[in-house]
């Protein structure tokens, strides 16, 4: 079974796909983009906040893999926090003109 939903925080949009196996195991795939203006720090921390809110709202879920899309990786990586999961960084600016997407 697959469920699709959209979550809007005050500064981000989150598109969620929930896959539920026959045994009840859940797997989420999220696409997140900031809706706020400003530079990379504001947009990055808005995404972090929205991710935290999503995880808190869903209960016992945790990230397994994150793929960050950065507009200027060489200058932005210093601000990115360490994660407790596998992470990849793609230096490809999001098409909507933002500085970062997840």
Give short role names for the model-derived ranges.
Residues 1-101:
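Short, polar/acidic, helix-capping and beta-turn segments at strand->helix junctions
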């Amino acid at each position: 079974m697959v469920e699709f939903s959209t979550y809007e925080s005050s500064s981000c949009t989150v598109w969620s796909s929930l896959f539920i196996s026959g045994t009840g195991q859940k797997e989420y795939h999220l696409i997140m983009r900031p809706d706020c203006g400003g530079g990379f720090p504001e947009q990055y921390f808005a995404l972090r906040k929205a991710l935290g809110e999503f995880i808190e709202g869903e209960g016992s879920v945790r990230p397994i893999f994150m793929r960050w899309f950065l507009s200027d990786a060489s200058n932005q990586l210093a601000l990115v926090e360490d994660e407790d999961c596998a992470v990849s960084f793609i230096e490809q600016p999001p098409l909507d003109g933002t500085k970062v997407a997840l």
